[in-house]
Amino acid sequence: MKKVQRYFLDYEFSKNNKSLEIKNENSFKIILNDKKNYEINKFFYKQIGKDHFWRDRLVWTDKQWLKYSSNPLLDTWILKDNNNDLIGYYEIEKHDNKEFELINMGILSDYRSKGFGSLLLDHVLKQSY
């Protein structure tokens, strides 16, 4: 069995934080999965997770996926290009004490190493304050 290591980021905002500058920012969009479509979460988890040993939710039924993605405290953001091709996503959960937890974030394999992960992380940080 391969050992998986988890990392945690505790980030405090200051006025000195700068946004990433992304070239051709009009060629993509980051949208909220406001319809709470569990199939989006399931698709990304399986596709991205197979390369990163995400296993916990592989046994979930559609009912479990629906319950998870319907959580009113959970937001799923989707990165798409202008052709509506999926690029990546992240799930963020709000907590009572004005904290946010980044549950999952990932980029589909065809789009990795092109700066999209940095773009999503920048979006995560902007959404959390």
Which role fits each region the language model picked out?
Residues 1-29, 34:
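Acyl-donor-binding surface of acyltransferase catalytic domains
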Residues 22-57:
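Short amphipathic alpha-helix that is part of the acyltransferase structural core
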Residues 38-42, 66, 118:
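An amphipathic alpha-helix signature
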Residues 42-45, 69, 125:
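A generic alpha-helix structural signal
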Residues 58-63, 69-108:
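A conserved beta-strand-loop-helix scaffold within acyl/acetyltransferase catalytic domains
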Residues 107, 113-128:
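Conserved acetyl-CoA-binding loop-helix of GNAT-fold acetyltransferases
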